[in-house]
């Protein structure tokens, strides 16, 4: 997915642009205790999320990457909800945070729709916004995070 991903290295240098560095980055993600999830359409991976544990046991940083051909069709929402559900239920996370480009309107809409809110007082620049979501939100408490059973032509799985 990442070899054809656009825009390359557009936000915080991720995903890495050069192929050798991309391979190193993916290897680090798999071997450093990062929780990884992928979404595929039966032929190839079209999305990837990761939860990186923070200094506190019940917090993590989230990153999400959706191939440009699949943005706006629900795959990102399904993958995001599945990842958050796993973080809430299996990892017992109390807080999930991420950074997003302030100009990325599609991502901001998606994130806000699943409960992320801007972090007040964060050192945000015009192009970057820190957001967080309490994992003990009503969606997780009410068993509404049903993302692994979505009706899209995609499959979501933990890697």
What function would you assign to each model-found segment?
Residues 2-12, 17, 26, 83, ...:
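Structured catalytic core of nucleotide-sugar glycosyltransferases
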Residues 4, 12-61, 67:
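Acetyl-CoA-dependent GNAT
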Residues 49, 62, 98, 127-129:
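A structural signal for short, well-ordered beta-strand segments
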Residues 66, 72-87, 109-113:
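Conserved acetyl-CoA-binding loop-helix of GNAT-fold acetyltransferases
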Residues 87-100:
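Conserved GNAT acetyl-CoA-binding A-motif
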Residues 112-122:
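Conserved acetyl-CoA-binding loop of GNAT-fold acetyltransferases
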Residues 121-159:
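C-terminal "cap" of GNAT-fold acetyltransferases
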